[in-house]
UniProtKB/Swiss-Prot annotation:
Keywords: Cell projection, Cilium, Cilium biogenesis/degradation, Cytoplasm, Cytoskeleton, Flagellum, Repeat, TPR repeat. GO terms for cellular component: 9+2 motile cilium; axoneme; centriole; ciliary basal body; ciliary base; ciliary pocket collar; ciliary tip; intraciliary transport particle B. One of its GO terms (molecular function) is kinesin binding. Gene3D superfamilies: Tetratricopeptide repeat domain. The keyword Repeat applies. It is found in: Cell projection, Cilium, Flagellum; Cytoplasm, Cytoskeleton, Flagellum axoneme; Cytoplasm, Cytoskeleton, Flagellum basal body. It comes from the Eukaryota. Residues 785-816 are annotated as: Disordered. Pfam families: TPR_6, TPR_8. Its main location: other. Component of the intraflagellar transport complex B (IFT-B) involved in flagellar assembly. This is Intraflagellar transport protein 88.
Length: 831
């Protein structure tokens, strides 16, 4: 009977040589240092193999290669600092050291281990630094030498570099040839590199004005990438392949190509594909909310992401990777908006219809916030065309849609915003009020108390509108220092632009209201502060205006508008030193901004620093003359300052220059006429006053000055004719009648003089009021004068204000450098 087989009870992993075999110990158990030695067997781990010699040929070669890599690193570091001489020196040392390594390996029988890839790498660095250092031809010759031994990805990289050099040299056909060779050698496992090659091929085709070829190259590349992605086996590998493929930039180039070809259907299709390939989902923690029912990103996350993109919020709280993602999203959003501005006039007969189409595409794809930004671009386009009403309607619609989206997502919008906008639909507003009242009940607050308080505020607001001057005080909100959640749904600048439009219309109450809404939505909007400050200045609330300008400066230290406007307020308050500092800051940032330099000189003049003011204005004249631009107001102010300094010759020179540019300026004519009279040049003075009489026909002042010049030059008969002409138009002018009598007596016509003296006596005894206006003046002339005054708007501040300032003479009072006494009238008055 055979015995059944059973497995062994021990593994028998320990074997012994000889006759020794494991036995049960008959002594006490203890630690044995070397159990095998007791059995007469030596362990194979007792001794290590002998250490190789330290100065072996392999170790020397390896150390020399390490030194080569150090030289390469130092050379490229120097090249990054644009120190190309040092970089070439390091690479030259690396080349020599590599030659020594090759000789060392050959002499020691190690020729098979020569590192050819290292040699190619060194020469590629050498050629790259030559190209960066302005030696493209030498770089090409270097690449031609190493391209013969290169293969695979290295060969593709060399051909790509050669194509870039030829492209920069303007050899676009050669560049295309090298790019084609590069893309043939590039492995399909390098999708980003292949994409870069295809993009550069398209750029070369664009330079050759071969737009269709450029589009075909990119479209062909995209089709190949889609085919490769579809051929990948698993979903994970397919997703990884898509992640390695950047489709946005190629599609952006395709869109521009179709725009150049003028194919509207292709433009719209490319824009739709560009939206699909863009990265527009935010990774901000507050906006991440996964919808469990749909296994994807919720609509609230998309809305929050689009809102964040539209407002371009600060990314300081993000880590480096998230900041890079945010930067990429911002770049994609900006390019989408630029594409919309580019395509809108080309895809429809009217530009507004093009914007509407693109906005609808964005809205259909779920990007509501960016569609509002596109509508904002349409509104800005209408503003450039001076279609203010249409632009205002569009921006109000944008505001309504943004706030309604916020309310639909359950985001709390304060009642103050809802009441100030007056722009929401009744359903959305009622829903918002109901939700907020329920929140108040949960907090134990009676909504009726707040409603009563609000009704009092409304009554006060209605009463204030009836006042002659609106007191638009801005109440500081406790939440004014932080951006509110609902602010992300209103594109930045909507209410700021609306406030600006109402400011131009002269509706300062509406302008202030929208500026305040803009600040409640975004307290860090410097332009809203500037608009509000300008509105306050129009209602003579200078302290409030200055406060807003200073806030705008705190938010944006580079805001020249806020600094300049603050300087104007300081100038109005006669704080000339502070105003001068503000204007100088603007001039330092914008050296060619003439208004800042002019106002700086004006501040110096007000501080009695006449020489410095003259020097500054002279520099301004030189700067304008270099570009053949001339401002008569600068010449006028220079003439006034030279007159204050006592240099009448220079003053007359600059007033003549101003008169050459603006011959209709009565202020300039008045000064020149008075200057000629003081120097007894009555004929030149008469010519000036005759020009003034043709400009201003509503007063006999200038005709009297002409007649007085004739009397001063002893031309009594011509003076008599002029006085009679004046009395035909102004029969009750006693001044003309008195001088007429005097002139008649001077030429011996006493009888006629007595007749005029009798008329003067009757006129004086009857106390008939003197008529200073021309009775025959046509109503058309008055209307033309009113139109000419109305045509001078806020944009003409430089010319208008300076003419008004120069309309007066200098008085003896040092506090007011420009008085209000007529120089010519004083000089021509007879004792």
């Amino acid at each position: 009977m055979t015995q059944n087989w059973r497995p062994q009870s021990r593994l028998q992993t320990m074997t012994f040589a000889g006759t020794a075999r494991p036995m049960t110990s008959m002594t006490a158990a203890g630690f044995t240092k070397n159990p095998l030695a007791t059995a007469g067997v030596a362990s194979i781990f007792d001794k290590l193999p002998p250490e190789p010699p330290k100065d072996s040929p392999e170790q020397k070669a390896d150390q020399m290669e390490i030194n080569i890599f150090k030289l390469l690193r130092d050379g490229m570091s120097a090249a990054s600092c644009k120190d190309y001489v040092t970089a070439l020196g390091r690479i030259r040392e690396a080349i020599k050291l590599e030659q020594k390594v090759s000789q060392h390996r050959t002499m020691n029988g190690l020729a098979d281990s020569i590192n050819l890839d290292l040699r190619t790498c060194i020469w590629m660095h050498w050629a790259q630094i030559q190209a960066l250092g302005g030696q493209p031809e030498m770089a090409l010759s270097t690449y031609e030498k190493i391209v013969k031994t290169a293969e695979g990805a290295t060969l593709a990289q060399i051909r790509f570099n050669m194509g870039n050099i030829n492209h920069n040299l303007g050899k676009y056909n050669e560049a295309l040839k090298n790019f084609r060779m590069a893309i043939d050698q590039a492995s399909p496992s390098l999708p980003r590199f292949r994409q870069k090659i295809a993009s550069h091929m398209a750029q070369s085709c664009i330079k050759l004005h071969r737009w269709q070829d450029a589009v075909d190259r990119i479209e062909e590349y995209l089709i190949k990438q889609y085919t490769l992605a579809s051929s990948v086996g698993t979903d994970v590998e397919r997703q990884n392949f898509y992640a390695m493929t950047t489709r946005f930039d190629p599609l952006y180039t395709v869109l521009i190509g179709y725009y150049a070809l003028g194919v509207p259907e292709k433009m719209i299709d490319a824009y739709s594909r560009l939206i699909d390939s863009s990265i527009l989902i935010s990774d901000h923690p507050d906006s991440l909310e996964i919808d469990d029912h749909h296994n994807g990103i919720s609509s609230k996350q998309i809305a929050m992401a689009d809102a964040e993109l539209c407002n371009m919020s600060n990314d300081d709280e993000l880590d480096d990777l998230s900041r890079y993602n945010a930067t990429l999203r911002h770049e994609h959003t900006n390019k989408l908006l630029i594409s919309a501005r580019l395509l809108a006039p080309a895809i429809a007969w009217e530009e507004s219809q093009g914007y509407a189409k693109l906005s609808d595409i964005l809205r259909e794809k779920g990007h509501h916030g960016i569609s509002l930004q596109v509508q904002m671009s349409m509104a800005l386009t209408l503003l450039k065309r001076n279609e203010f009403e249409k632009a205002t309607d569009i921006m109000l619609r944008i505001d309504r849609e943004g706030l309604e989206s916020a309310l639909a997502l359950g985001i709390n919008v304060p009642l103050s915003i809802l009441q100030k906008t007056r722009n929401l639909s009744l359903t959305a507003a009622a829903t918002a009020v109901t939700n907020q009242e329920s929140d108040l009940h949960l907090l134990g607050i009676d909504p009726s108390v707040l409603a009563n308080q609000q009704s009092v505020v409304d009554r006060d607001a209605v009463a204030s509108r009836g006042a002659p001057e609106v007191d638009m005080l801005k109440t500081d909100d406790d939440n004014g220092t932080k951006k509110q959640p609902y602010a992300a749904f209103v594109p930045r600048g909507v209410h700021t632009n609306i406030a600006f439009i109402y400011y131009l219309k002269g509706d300062y109450e509406a302008s202030a209201r929208h500026a305040q809404i803009a600040l409640e939505i975004d307290p860090y909007d410097s332009f809203a502060h500037i608009n509000l400050g300008c509105t306050y200045s129009k209602t003579n609330q200078w302290e409030l205006s200055l406060r807003e300008f200073l806030k705008a400066q705190e938010i944006n230290m580079e805001s020249v508008q806020a600094t300049y406007n603050a300087g104007l307020v300081y100038f109005k308050q006669q704080e000339y030193k502070t105003a001068y500092s503000c204007f100088q800051k603007v001039a330092s940032k914008l050296p060619s901004y003439g208004d800042a330099i002019y106002m700086s000189a004006d501040c110096l003049a007000r501080m009695s620093q006449i020489d410095e003011a003259i020097q500054m204005l002279s520099n301004l004249v030189t700067m304008f003359s270099a570009v053949k631009a001339y401002d008569p107001s600068i010449y006028i102010r220079l003439g006034e300052l030279y007159s204050i300094a006592g240099d009448e010759g220079q003053a007359a020179h600059y007033f003549k220059e101003a008169h050459r540019l603006v011959p209709f300026s009565l202020a300039v004519i008045n000064w020149l006429g008075s200057h000629y009279i003081k120097n007894e040049l009555y004929e030149q003075a008469r010519v000036c006053f005759e020009k003034a009489s043709r400009v201003d026909t509503t007063t006999p002042k200038w005709s009297l000055a002409v007649a007085a010049c004739l009397r001063k030059s002893k031309q009594y008969r011509d003076a008599i004719y002029e006085y009679k002409h004046i009395l035909k138009r102004f029969p009750t002018n006693t001044t003309a009648m008195t001088h007429l009598i005097s002139s008649l007596n001077n030429i011996g016509q006493h009888k006629e003089a007595d007749e005029w003296a009798e008329k003067l006596t009757k006129l004086t005894n009857n106390k008939v009021p003197e008529v200073t206006e021309d009775r025959e003046l046509d109503e058309f002339v008055k209307q033309e004068r009113r139109n000419s005054v109305a045509a001078v708007g806020p944009g003409s501040r430089a010319g208008q204000d300076r003419f008004e300032a120069s309309n007066n003479r200098v008085s003896s009072n040092t506090g007011d450098l420009f008085g209000d006494v007529d120089i010519a009238e004083e000089l021509l008055t007879e004792n």
